[in-house]
């Protein structure tokens, strides 16, 4: 009987150790599993909150259709809401509805959305950290890592001298449940950031307000954009944009000195985005190098 009990205890210890044992995992696995596209194959949304000193200071909400980023501030909040077609930006007293343009016509904000991706918010360069340990328990994997020497050298200009991280992952999917980040700076200041991830979360309140507003026809105005007017490259596109918001046109820095905006076909009246934000609008875009 004693042998049976002893064997049972030994078996229990073995199973416990196995359940809490080391696990092989790479940062590349974590990085790949937490790409926005990968996460949204299994979830309708990804909601990421960064907390420091007990207060949320950054929110990211992602779906297949849009990316939302909100940062509360002492004097004013900062918010961006990006779809493939447009981007809302709230900073200070200005709320701007941007569209992206190129010399060849209208572009999209695919790159803007990528910058607010889950991988960008949750984990950076897969080669920028070194895993020190990884263990598995109760269906979760806990990974301890530190910045690589190269990453520390790259971050020297902002004063970071060291950093360590703790990832808590779903053992099956490798999806990040939480991330704790500890940064030490050359002035002796330490920053402790806790990142929590919620999958299939409800839409944040401010974003609900934006979506509800733009879904009401009476809140929209027609904006017609005529690119390269009077040339063989002329292109016209009409979109609906929210009333009350400044209508902005965004373009690459490389073409900044070659583009002009007007409100008449003869390209004599310069476009003033603050002039009237409630009525229908036509903007003529003249590219001076085409």
Where are these regions (language model features)?
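An acidic-aromatic
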Residues: 55-117
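Short amphipathic beta-strand and strand-loop transition segments with alternating hydrophobic
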Residues: 127-136, 183
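Gly/Pro-enriched, hydrophobic low-complexity segments
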Residues: 74-75, 138-217
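Sec-dependent N-terminal signal peptides of Gram-positive bacterial secreted proteins and lipoproteins
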Residues: 4-22
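Hydrophobic lipid-interacting interfaces of membrane-associated proteins
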Residues: 49-55, 93-94, 184-188
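Secondary-structure capping and domain/repeat boundary segments
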Residues: 218-290
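Short, solvent-exposed coil/turn segments at beta-strand boundaries
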Residues: 38-45, 60-69, 81-87, 138, ...
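N-terminal leader/targeting segments and the immediate start of mature chains
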Residues: 16-64, 203-218
């Amino acid at each position: 009987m004693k042998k049976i009990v002893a064997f049972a205890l030994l078996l229990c210890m073995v199973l416990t150790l196995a359940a809490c044992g080391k696990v092989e995992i790479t940062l590349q696995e974590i990085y790949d599993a937490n790409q926005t596209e990968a996460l949204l194959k299994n979830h309708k949304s990804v909601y990421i909150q960064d907390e420091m000193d007990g207060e949320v200071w950054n929110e990211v909400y992602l779906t297949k259709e849009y990316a939302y980023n909100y940062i509360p501030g002492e004097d004013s909040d900062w918010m961006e809401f990006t779809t493939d077609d447009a981007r809302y930006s709230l900073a200070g007293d200005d709320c701007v509805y941007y569209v992206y343009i190129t010399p060849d016509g209208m572009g999209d904000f695919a790159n803007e959305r990528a910058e607010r991706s889950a991988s960008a918010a949750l984990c950076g360069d897969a080669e920028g950290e070194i895993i020190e340990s990884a263990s598995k328990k109760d269906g979760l994997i806990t990974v301890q890592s530190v910045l690589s020497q190269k990453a520390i050298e790259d971050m020297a200009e902002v004063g970071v001298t060291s950093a360590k991280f703790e990832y808590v992952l779903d053992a099956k999917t490798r999806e990040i449940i939480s991330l704790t980040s500890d940064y030490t700076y050359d002035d002796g200041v330490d920053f402790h950031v806790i990142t929590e991830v919620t999958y299939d979360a409800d839409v944040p309140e401010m974003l609900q307000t934006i979506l509800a507003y733009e879904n009401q026809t009476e809140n929209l105005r027609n904006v017609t954009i005529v690119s390269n007017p009077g040339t063989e490259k002329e292109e016209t596109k009409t979109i609906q944009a929210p009333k009350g918001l400044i209508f902005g046109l965004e373009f690459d820095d490389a073409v900044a000195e070659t583009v002009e905006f007007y409100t008449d076909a003869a390209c004599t009246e310069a476009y003033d985005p603050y002039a009237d934000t409630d009525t229908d609008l036509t903007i003529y875009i003249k590219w001076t190098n085409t």
